[in-house]
Every structure is written in C-alpha cells, then in structure tokens.
Amino acid sequence: MQTRITSLRHARTAIRILAACVVAAMMLPTIGACTSPRIAGRAESEHQVSECEIAYRSATAGDERARTAPLLERYLAVSSSAQAWQTVAAICPQRLSEGIIRSAQAQWNAQNIADSLSTTYTASTADGNALRRQRLDGVTSLPLDNTTLRHLALAEDRAGSAMQLLAAKNAPGATLTLSDNHHAAGSQLMTLAGNNGDLRQKEYDVSALIANPSTATDHNTGLTAASAAIVEMDCTLEELAALSAAGQAPATGDAATRTQQMLTVIRLVTGHCYQAFANGYPSGDFAVFASTSKQ
C-alpha cells in the first residue's frame, strides 16, 4: 500500500513539473512581446541621405534612362546626366575622377545623339555655366592648395607644348588654339598659386611625338589612338591625379561658393577629357577607367 502511495506522489510531481514547463513555454512569446518591437522601416527612415548620395543616385538614374529610352529621351537623359555627374565630382571627393569622366562620356554621347537628331548640343558654350572649359578667364579663386595648383599648371603647360608641336606638323585634331588654351590655363593657375614654386619647364621631352605625330600607342592602355587625343587624355589623367591628392585651401566663404569654385576646375578637366574623345580617344569604360586605374 505504501509503495502505491509513493508511486502516485511521484506521478503527481512529474505532472506538476511538466505543466509548469508548458506554462513557461507558453509565456515566452508574451515576454518577448514586452520588449521594444522593431518598427518596420524605422532604421531606414533614421538614415540621413547625404547630398553626395542624392547626386550619385540622380546621375546613375540618368545613365539608366540613357541606355533604355528612345533616341530623343536618351538625348535629354545624357544631357541631364552630364550635369549630375559634375555635381557628384564636386561634392563627393571619393568620386571626383569618376564624376569627371562620366560627365565627359555623357557629353560626348549627347553630341553624337545630337548629330543623329540634326540638332546642336550646346554644352561647350563659353559662359561660366558651361559644362566644359578650356581656360580660366575671369577666375579669381579656387578651393585648392598652392601645391595642387602648381601641378595643374604643369599639366596644362606640358599639354600646350605637345599640342603646339603637333599643330606644327598638321597632326589630326591638333590646333594652335588648343595649344594656346592649355598655355593660358597654365599661366592662370600659376597666378592663382601666387607665382611661387613654378613647376613648368621651358622644354619637355617630345621625342615620341616627333616620331609619331599622327598616331601612337597609349602607354596607359596599349591602345592605338591619335597622338592629339593621347595628349589630351594624358593631361586629363595628370590633373585627376593632382586633384585626387589635393589639399583644400583655407575655407573662405560658404559651402555653396566653394562648390561652384570646384565646378570650375571640374569643367576644365572635363573639357580636356571630352577633347580627347573628340580627337579619337576611345570613350568606353574599357579605355578610360583602365587609364585612371594606373594613375
């Protein structure tokens, strides 16, 4: 009899333990529900989208439309994209080279589409709002340190001397106007640098140009292109390297003013990149981004 009572007690104890476990398991979701729930989209909404991200999204969206839209819409898209990529270059330091090259590509595409539509692409006008510049007339300040300005001046002067030689040899794409513009930009940049520590040289090694005034092998890509096109691309890459390593001058004025000043430099370099395309340098990513990767 005692054994039977003991067995019943053990059974009841086991049942109580099992019941307690079941209740505890049922309460776990309720306990979890008492913690702060994650509101869908909360983290996303708390992320502050930067001006750089907004500009980059706008530029890439324009590129996408340019790939898929009908011809007229493509023209409008690449025209808009050209401006958007310059904004990216101005406010996203880590995307400066990409922004300049993409803008030049977009402008070159716009020019080609304009030709197909028998219209005129006007981004090359000489006013301060143009997307391309060849010189810095009227510019009195740039948000760059003097060392960077001196290296930009050297690149312009080197290109000017090379273009002068090619123009004298009647090389395709080479003109004295291009040479004069490069030399003028170099002088203007040195003036902005205070005319101290001038890196420009009276003579440059032009033996390769003398031997190959019409076409040459681009040392950056191994591709054959017009010598005048390679001169413009070399100038572009030299200036991109200088800007990528640039320090900023002491802040003077508001951020909007500095952005506008930076756009002036960006449009100068964009102009050289575009001119390289116009002279026959390949405008595809396989060429231009292979070149920048070696800088």
What residues fall within each predicted segment?
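Sec-dependent bacterial lipoprotein signal peptides
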Residues: M1-C34
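All-alpha RGS (Regulator of G-protein Signaling) helical domain and cognate RGS-like helical scaffolds
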Residues: Q2-R4, C34-Q295
